[in-house]
Amino acid sequence: LNLASFEINFSNIGKIKKGAKVGVTALTWATNVTPIIQLGLIPVVVDISIATLNVSPETLTPHLSNIDVFFATNVLGFADKIDVIRKMCKKHNIVFIEDNCESLGSEVDNELLGNFGLAATFSFFVAHHISTIEGGMIVTDDENLYTALVMARANGWDRNLPSDKQAALRKKVGIDAFSAKYT
């Protein structure tokens, strides 16, 4: 799921460029770091606050000038000053993505985690808060990212998109009426 999130951002909508440095929480899981490496991105470990087990504005500050993306893991439903971190990322043009595999339903100042970054991932692995044995979801309010995610879910087909989005995409990439039957 994290691989999908990064790959879509990286290759399909161009928010993340190859070789970009991605800040990752020091307390994380291999499934957060491995996709970064697989896609030719460079992980940069950002220390945590021992009080919250998460990156804090203070631990993120030294990295603001040398990362392009920040992938925050909200451990055990906690998020240390995430609104401040969101503003810091925005000010420095850093793409902000949340990992909420342990934070489904958690709130900060009456705002659900998963609403702070460009996208947020949630895991439904057997050991997490909601389980379907495997799988997960990505949420976003970015229309381009959403469209790319819907198409990725359908192996690149545009069938699950509204007809106006299908028409716009087909026009953009030059797919004629005959070929459109197979997209």
Give the location of each predicted region.
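ANL superfamily AMP-binding
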Residues: L1-K21
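Short hydrophobic "helix-edge" motifs at membrane interfaces and signal-peptide entry regions
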Residues: A30, C89-K90, N115, S131-I133
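Buried hydrophobic packing segments
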Residues: L1-S5, I36, G136
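PLP-dependent aminotransferase-like
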Residues: I16-K91, V95-N100, E107
